[in-house]
Amino acid sequence: MTANKHGFEPKTEFTIGGIAFTVIQTGEDWVKCIASECVEERAFDAKNRNDFAASDIRAYLNGEFLRRLIAAGAPEEMFEYFNIDLTADDGLKTYGGDRVRVGLITCEEYRLFREHIPALPNDWWWTATADSPINSFVRYVSTDGTLYVSYAIDGGGGVRPLCNLKSEILKSYLSGGYEKQDAPEDQREKAVDMMKHIAAAWDIDAEEVFGRADE
């Protein structure tokens, strides 16, 4: 794991937009963090789709939830786009990948960074990983930390948002010295992000239209 030049380390906890987050991975100028607790309970998808890219939970996290953080004072420029590998738990790569500003942890990431993730002995919570494209199950983390499955339509699943944050802005924000920059927003990336979600929702091969998320 790369050391962060702004001093953030795994297991560091801080509050942004009224939500407590814990660092699980560091890069030189960014940190990946997960909500320290479940922020709410909701279905992965009301239509029982287990493809994160097409899901209601994905739309919620990158829409209403992100707007709520920003409205509570979190700098919008702090949230980086990052890739999510949507390989299913059975190894099938039907769902490809996705690119988001707020996501959910995958099963592979959970295994890799488990020691940095606060345990929740009273809640179970969704991952972004489908059990298989041939069913409607989504993998989730149980109260004892093991991985199980539930239907995507299950409304009792906990939500622990995952973010990649620019650590320079994060440090300034936490110290109270952040001032919004006047640099123009990347409207093209936002538009592509929206179109990819629409394509996934309508079962269009987004990779053929926009290219792979990891390119």
Residue ranges and their predicted role:
Residues 1-189, 194, 200:
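Collagenous Gly-X-Y triple-helix signature in extracellular proteins
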Residues 203-214:
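Short, charge-rich amphipathic interface segments used for partner binding and complex assembly
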